[in-house]
């Protein structure tokens, strides 16, 4: 799901029950409307090489397999097969979290990555020294690609892929020293109580997927729950932040 100026945009698999989805939106009573367009068949194998390149963020460098040789000199090289999962380092939100987490994650940390997608953030956390990383993903279609990326980067012993709802899983994963959440702002607000409850006393939450225009509203929503802003990055229209318990 992607937040756009006039609402939300998402992708649905072929054969999705569009009428049921439209009825559910109307039944919510929000006054929202819904429209569709056919994306057609996408040949991911030929699309990605033209769109995905090498991205360097501090000590971390991210590249697809066909460009892996170009990041051999990086302190922390990460090779990600794009497939259909979000998180190749191309987007500002991914780069924002990658930048912030380098000053936060310590050797031996327990980390939870909510909405793990391609598992790029989970892999980065492990390579930064985390001893245990729970990569939580609700989209079952993303799991296989994430598992392959975890294996490819040699962090299988520290990163566990978990399919499920972050709100239900966080209490089981607690206490967590660092929580990573690159998801839309409305979901971050929904998860904020569970994140605060699961966080270790000296823990940190690093969030992204938030528009700069949503910054103040998000902070106003989560500060009463016991969060304070420690660091932030704005990249174009996107905002990433490090939050601490207070």
PLM features: residue spans?
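N-terminal auxiliary segments of SAM/dcSAM-dependent transferases
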Residues: 1-72
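Short aromatic/hydrophobic contact patches that present stacked aromatics
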Residues: 9-11, 85, 180
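S-adenosylmethionine
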Residues: 104, 138-246
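Conserved SAM/SAH cofactor-binding pocket of Class I
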Residues: 84, 88-167, 175
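Proteins enriched for Cys/Gly/acidic motifs involved in redox and nucleic-acid/cofactor modification
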Residues: 54, 58-92, 98
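Conserved beta-strand segments of alpha/beta enzyme cores
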Residues: 33-35, 61, 132, 158-160, ...
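Short, well-ordered coil/turn elements that cap or connect secondary structure elements
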Residues: 29-31, 57, 73, 106, ...
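Short beta-strand micro-motifs in enzyme catalytic cores
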Residues: 6-8, 76, 239-241
């Amino acid at each position: 799901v992607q937040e756009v100026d006039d609402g939300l945009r998402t992708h649905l698999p072929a054969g999705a029950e569009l009428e049921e989805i439209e009825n559910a939106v109307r039944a919510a009573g929000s006054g929202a409307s819904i429209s569709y367009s056919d994306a057609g068949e996408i040949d991911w194998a030929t699309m990605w090489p033209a769109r995905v390149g090498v991205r360097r963020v501090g000590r971390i460098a991210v590249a697809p397999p066909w460009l892996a040789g170009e990041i051999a000199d990086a302190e922390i090289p990460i090779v990600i097969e794009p497939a259909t999962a979000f998180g190749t380092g191309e987007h500002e939100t991914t780069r924002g979290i990658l930048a912030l987490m380098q000053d936060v994650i310590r050797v031996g940390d327990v980390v939870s990555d909510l909405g793990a997608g391609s598992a790029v953030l989970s892999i980065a956390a492990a390579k930064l020294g985390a001893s245990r990383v729970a990569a939580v993903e609700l989209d079952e279609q993303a799991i296989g690609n994430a598992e392959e990326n975890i294996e490819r980067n040699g962090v299988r012993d520290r990163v566990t892929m978990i399919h499920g709802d972050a709100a239900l899983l966080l209490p089981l994963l607690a206490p967590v020293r660092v929580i990573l959440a690159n998801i839309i702002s409305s979901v971050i607000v929904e998860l904020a109580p569970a994140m605060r409850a699961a966080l270790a006393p000296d823990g940190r939450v690093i969030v992204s997927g938030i528009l700069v225009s949503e910054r103040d509203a998000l902070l106003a929503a989560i500060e009463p729950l016991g969060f304070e802003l420690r660091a932030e990055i704005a990249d174009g229209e996107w905002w990433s932040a490090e939050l601490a318990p207070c």
